[in-house]
């Protein structure tokens, strides 16, 4: 079966936005106008087809990225819905990996909000070309031009409007298309399905001319031939302007900018046209890099084409009540039929693909074969996890691995009834497979099950999903912070482990130097043994001993981070030495050295941004100071005060409730992990005493 739509007519896009900028509504409208969903779903009443998990319906925020396919003017658009909440940035990063372009949705009133900055940085990191849709133009306080200047000031990007609004707030009627120089006015009877093309209103002609000139200049700058023509005073054709804007958009030099009101069904078609005109096809983005699975030092670049052996990346795992486990895969090269085998090069295992499903919001369609540039769900994979590469055994390649952040918050969970113990274990493991930023382990001392994640909301949703999807009700303990330990000075230490009591003895003797590393460097082991004073085969055992010992530090038993150990001397015994003996010697030497190396306790410090009306500013700052916060900056954002601070996570529990009562529900905040910082002496002492209990 040959492919129906050529590769250059495919667009893989993500729609990324801050909460409440209207992202899900925008996606919904796209599905409506491209003929997928017949009744327009509203987030307000929880019926949107994209938000298909129950909790999302209740909370009205999008949690998991579902991939949906729709068609517009002979083009296939695959939309990956990305969550807009800070606790889910992992989901956003993951979808950024497999996108070719993104539409950033901003609210015309709120503009660029903290989460939008985070998402923007992630899109920069993965080199995703993007365009902007300014939504909610019908709201009170809507201002398209404000958002334009915020994008250049805050995001340091260059927005180029290709349409400008006609009216704003309740007089918002449509847009002026700066390419055709016509006004597109939507009529409300057809639910926005049709618009009338009219002459530009007299009071907007001057503004339209000014913005058209800016747009043409931006387009001309992207290409030498166009620049020459422009400087010679010749008119650029519509096609030439589009070409210039497309080149600039792909190079991330400019950001095409549009506006509308998804809720009021205005401006969505022009957005779809722009997606096709400016965002790249899979063939127009840089080749993805990978390494040879047989020899990881050898780089391979994988070109988007149907030719060549199959290669794809698993970017999302979901459990579907009817089909079982779905593995969402982006195909980069080649094609694959359902029922065939794929090779998971990350794990080194072969798996059979039972079915291939194309997802349309919440409906699914079985397909026989999938081609390069496509995104679809594989059914039947048992071993594959997020970030694994699937390819053909003939040409095994490992595509770039995704990096996942370490969790910063943990809570103990136990099932309400003993009978649910096993069910809870199964449920948590399934959820951990879906979400790499969520971990499950059991506390050896207390035997409790501990779950860890990226924030309170993240863990709340996990507990909620256990109840809904797996029917397990859980009791939740107090949140615990992921403390760490580190050392502040360098120490040399000798340790001899010798046991001589009948039978074979044990003998391991090491000299190590323990020294601090800069924050975030992690653990480094240096082998500086010369002349064979310790045989080669025992050296990894010393490293292993240190790795085991660093899991539980000398102060309060927290993992030790950011240090370097150099093994520089030692001795061995022909008969009694063994790997075991050197492992024990390594771990004892490390523990002894750590006690003398000025150990300190570290805690996660969060970057917190609070938005409050001016009247409450003093109270909120006072409260942040009481929470050991360090205020970094204060500013204004469209009439609201914005406070940026670093605050220890340990002090932030229950903050949302406190902020609500302090500001009568008018304050909002976001927080994300920033770095680990040293715990002050008096507090550190309390924590250590409590741990040793």
Curated annotation (Swiss-Prot):
One Pfam family linked to the record: EFG_C
Binding site for GTP: 17-24, 81-85, 135-138
GO CC annotations on file: cytoplasm
Alphabetized GO MF terms: GTP binding; GTPase activity; translation elongation factor activity
Location in or out of the cell: Cytoplasm
Domain tr-type G: 8-283
UniProt-listed InterPro entries: EF-G-like_DII, EFG_II, EFG_III, EFG_III/V, EFG_IV, EFG_V, EFG_V-like, G_TR_CS
Biological process per Gene Ontology, one example term: ribosome disassembly
Classification via NCBIfam families: EF-G, PRK12740.1-3, PRK12740.1-5, PRK13351.1-1, small_GTP
PANTHER family: RIBOSOME-RELEASING FACTOR 2, MITOCHONDRIAL, TRANSLATION ELONGATION FACTOR G-RELATED
HAMAP family on file: EF_G_EF_2_B (MF_00054_B)
Function summary: Catalyzes the GTP-dependent ribosomal translocation step during translation elongation. During this step, the ribosome changes from the pre-translocational (PRE) to the post-translocational (POST) state as the newly formed A-site-bound peptidyl-tRNA and P-site-bound deacylated tRNA move to the P and E sites, respectively. Catalyzes the coordinated movement of the two tRNA molecules, the mRNA and conformational changes in the ribosome.
Name of the protein described by the UniProt record: Elongation factor G
Gene it is expressed from: fusA
């Amino acid at each position: 079966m040959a492919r129906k739509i050529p590769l250059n007519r495919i667009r893989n896009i993500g729609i990324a936005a801050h909460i409440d900028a209207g992202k899900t509504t925008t996606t919904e409208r796209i599905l409506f106008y491209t003929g997928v969903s017949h009744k327009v779903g509203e987030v307000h009443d929880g019926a949107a087809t994209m938000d298909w998990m129950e909790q999302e319906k209740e909370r009205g925020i999008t949690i998991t990225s579902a991939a949906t396919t729709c068609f517009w003017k002979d083009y296939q658009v695959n939309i990956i819905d990305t969550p807009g909440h800070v606790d889910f940035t992992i989901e956003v990063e993951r979808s950024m990996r497999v996108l070719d372009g993104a539409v950033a949705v901003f609210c015309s009133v709120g503009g660029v909000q903290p989460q939008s900055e985070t998402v923007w940085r992630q899109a920069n990191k993965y080199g995703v070309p993007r365009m902007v849709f300014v939504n909610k133009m019908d709201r009170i306080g809507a201002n398209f031009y404000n958002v334009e200047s915020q994008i250049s000031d805050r995001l340091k990007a260059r927005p180029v409007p290709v349409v400008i609004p006609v009216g704003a707030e309740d007089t918002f009627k449509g847009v002026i298309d700066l390419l055709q120089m016509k006004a597109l006015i939507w009529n409300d009877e057809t639910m926005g399905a049709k618009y009338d093309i009219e002459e530009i209103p007299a009071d907007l002609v001057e503004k339209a001319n000014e913005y058209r000139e800016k747009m043409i200049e931006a387009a001309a700058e992207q290409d030498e031939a166009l620049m020459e023509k422009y400087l010679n005073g010749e008119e650029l054709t519509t096609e030439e302007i589009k070409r210039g804007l497309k080149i600039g958009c792909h190079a991330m030099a400019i950001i095409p900018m549009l506006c509308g009101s998804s809720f009021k069904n205005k401006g969505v078609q022009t957005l779809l046209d722009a997606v096709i005109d400016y965002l790249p096809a899979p063939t127009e983005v840089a080749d993805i890099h990978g390494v040879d699975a047989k020899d990881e030092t050898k780089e391979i670049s994988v070109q988007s084409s149907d030719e060549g052996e199959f290669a794809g990346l698993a970017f999302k795992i979901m459990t579907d009540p009817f089909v079982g486990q779905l593995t969402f895969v982006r195909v980069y090269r080649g094609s694959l039929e359902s029922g065939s085998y794929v090779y998971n090069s990350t794990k080194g295992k072969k798996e059979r693909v039972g079915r291939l499903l194309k997802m349309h919001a919440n409906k699914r369609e079985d397909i026989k074969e999938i081609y390069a540039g496509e995104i679809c769900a594989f059914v039947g994979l048992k071993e594959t996890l997020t970030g694994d590469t699937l390819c053909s055994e003939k040409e095994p390649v490992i595509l770039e691995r995704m990096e996942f952040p370490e969790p910063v918050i943990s809570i103990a969970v136990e099932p309400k009834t003993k009978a649910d113990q096993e069910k809870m274990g199964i449920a948590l493991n399934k959820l951990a497979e879906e979400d790499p930023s969520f971990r499950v382990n059991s506390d050896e001392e207390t035997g409790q099950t501990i779950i860890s994640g990226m924030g309170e909301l993240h863990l709340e949703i996990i507990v909620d999903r256990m109840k809904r999807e797996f029917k397990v009700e859980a009791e939740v303990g107090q949140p615990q912070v992921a403390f760490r330990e580190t050392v502040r000075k360098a120490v040399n230490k000798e340790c001899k482990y010798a046991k001589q009591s009948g039978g074979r003895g044990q003998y391991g003797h090491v000299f190590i130097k323990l020294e601090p590393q800069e924050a975030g460097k992690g653990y480094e082991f240096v082998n500086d043994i010369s002349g064979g004073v310790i045989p080669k085969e025992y050296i990894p055992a010393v490293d292993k001993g240190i790795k085991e010992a660093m899991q539980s530090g000398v102060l309060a038993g927290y993992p030790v981070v950011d240090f370097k150990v150099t093994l520089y001397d030692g001795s061995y015994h022909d008969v009694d030495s063994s790997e075991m003996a050197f492992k024990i010697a390594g771990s004892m030497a490390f523990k002894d050295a750590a006690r003398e190396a000025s150990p300190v306790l570290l805690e996660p410090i969060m970057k917190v941004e609070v938005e409050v009306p001016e009247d409450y500013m003093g109270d909120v700052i006072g409260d942040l100071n009481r929470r050991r916060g360090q205020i970094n900056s204060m500013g204004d954002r469209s009439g609201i005060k914005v406070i940026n601070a670093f605050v220890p996570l340990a002090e932030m529990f229950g903050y949302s409730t406190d902020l609500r009562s302090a500001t009568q529900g008018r304050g909002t905040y976001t927080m994300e992990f920033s770095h680990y910082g040293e715990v002050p002496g008096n507090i550190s002492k309390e924590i250590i005493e409590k741990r040793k209990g």
